[in-house]
Amino acid sequence: MSAGSGRRSKWDQPGPPTTTLLLPGVIPAIIPFTAGAFLSPPEIAAADATSEAVSAPSGALDAAAAVAAKINAMLVAKGKIKPSQNATEKVHVPGKAPAAAKSKDDLVVAEVEINDVPLTCRNLLTRGQTQDEISRMSGAAVSTRGRYMTAEEKAKIGPGDRPLYLHVQGQTRELVDRAVNRIKEIITSGVVKAATGSSPTFNGATVTVYHQPAPVTPVVSAAPPKPQFQSGMHYVQDKLFVGLEHAVATFNVKEKVEGPGCSYLQHIQMETGAKVFLRGKGSGCIEPASGREAFEPMYIYISHPKPEGLAAAKKLCENLLQTVHAEYNRFVNQITSTAPMTGYAQPPQISSVSMQPQYYPPNGYQTGFPVVQPPAPQPAVQVPYVVSTPIASPVPPPPGVVPNMAAPVPAVPTCYPIPQVQPPGLSLPVPPQGQKRRFTEELPEERDSRLLGYQHGPIHMTNLGTGFLVQSKMDGASVRSDTVVVKERERDRQLMPPPGFPVSAQKEPEEKSAAGTLGVAEDNSIKKLKTSDKTFGLVAYAGDSSDEEEDHGVLKNSGWSAGYQYPASQQQQRPKPQMPFWMAP
């Protein structure tokens, strides 16, 4: 096809005249593009200007130049390639490539270590969505650098290896501060959640921010904001648990760790420049997030701007805790060693009380020394000691009663209970003795009320002298002689009325002659005495009773106090005497 023909296709090859029009040093219109190639737009523009005769490839060159310029700008902005010197001298789009280079030199970089934060918090900070949110909020770029390392791996860390941290960079310090504060809030919330959950694997959030100042630039105004950025920096943090949660209550753990007036912790702060204080249960430190003490056991919180200072403060705190533990062990050993001695000192006091006399007489005997209340004495111990003292009585006993005379009580045919007189040494309870004394003291009143024997019949039926002789014989058997008893019996016979049978009338003069020497006043007194003594156990009088009394005289003298009485058959067989008319009731 000739050059003057009509329409041409883009596939048409240019003729020789067109090749002669190409200037030396001008790049071809279509060149292969590589990632590292750098196309200069001025050269492309010069080629377009010199190839005015060739109108076919002009559109393709413009498109290639535009694409190359865009790609070069993107690569320069990302730092993948560096612009050449001739390109900077022939800038047709002023301000783009030099602006990118200038922004890279003035970037403020900060690093936040998140290797030791709780797992949930670490996972949240390494997520791309969280980092994009922080970048949009602050305007600074956030990226993850390093890798997670355990304590053993940290000890064996290489020169080019670093623990996990966040890389923050921005145009100004304000943007970086904003991003760092947001990261701090996320870490703080994660620490509070971990403390609430009492995670045993959490050793405290160790957050370190390193501020990398910009290289030396002619602008000096960037230096003054440096202290402001450092004021918001995080410190390297760590904690040491005290480990005395179950200590004895008398051992004040907080005071032992802090020292007098917190002197121990203040000494560590002065030596290392770190911030050291107690936190956790029983520390008295109120957490700002929860408004109360932390749920964790008591621990020492340490923070320092540099890892070296943190290590020095941690070592001093470990030495302090070792001293506190040793002191607590000595305290516990002292308590366990003194406990048996304290318990052994008590038995001498108890034995001293038991050495006091345990018996006290019931009559209120007072000793010469203060009386110590002894334990309740056994009943068997009190019996042999009662013999020594008589029992006081509010009413004196009758004069005829001899307390130390023991005599058996005869069985009388009466319905009244017969008091038994026993020596005080054999009477155990006091109340029965009082009842006996009251009973014997009431007997004279009963005898006085029936002095003459007029109960329900005549005198010779009620005042015979053969009835109640228990008390009188018991009282006077040991004192009176046998002759006195015989005389009293004869007087009783003389004072009795004349019997109704002739036999008794014949014996009456003999009895009167035997007792004729007695006076009338003496007879009356004896009669009153005998009637007062003989009120119980009355027996009917018979004419022939004198013979029976003589037959039983020996028994009456020797054994009347032993409870002798006439057989009931003889008493029932005796006929009743006829009563004179003048003695009828």
Swiss-Prot record:
Record-annotated KH domain positions: 105-185, 240-322
Subcellular location: Nucleus; Cytoplasm
Any one Gene Ontology BP term: mRNA splice site recognition
Main location, first listed in the record: nucleus
Matches recorded under Gene3D superfamilies: K Homology domain, type 1 (3.30.1370.10)
Protein's UniProt keywords contain Amino-acid biosynthesis: no
Coiled-coil ranges (or none): none
Domain comment in the entry: The C-terminal part is necessary for the interaction with the PRP19C/Prp19 complex/NTC/Nineteen complex.
The keyword Cytoplasm appears for this protein: yes
UniProt region (Required for nuclear retention), positions on chain: 455-523
Gene Ontology MF term list: RNA binding
Gene Ontology cellular component terms for the protein in this record: cytoplasm; nucleus
Record's protein name: KH homology domain-containing protein 4
Keywords: Cytoplasm, mRNA processing, mRNA splicing, Nucleus, Phosphoprotein, RNA-binding
Family stated for the protein in its record: Belongs to the KHDC4 family.
Pfam families per the UniProt record, alphabetical: KH-I_KHDC4-BBP, KH_12
Free-text function comment from the UniProt entry: RNA-binding protein involved in pre-mRNA splicing. Interacts with the PRP19C/Prp19 complex/NTC/Nineteen complex which is part of the spliceosome. Involved in regulating splice site selection. Binds preferentially RNA with A/C rich sequences and poly-C stretches.
Organism from which the protein derives: Xenopus laevis
Ranges where the record places region Disordered: 482-516, 543-585
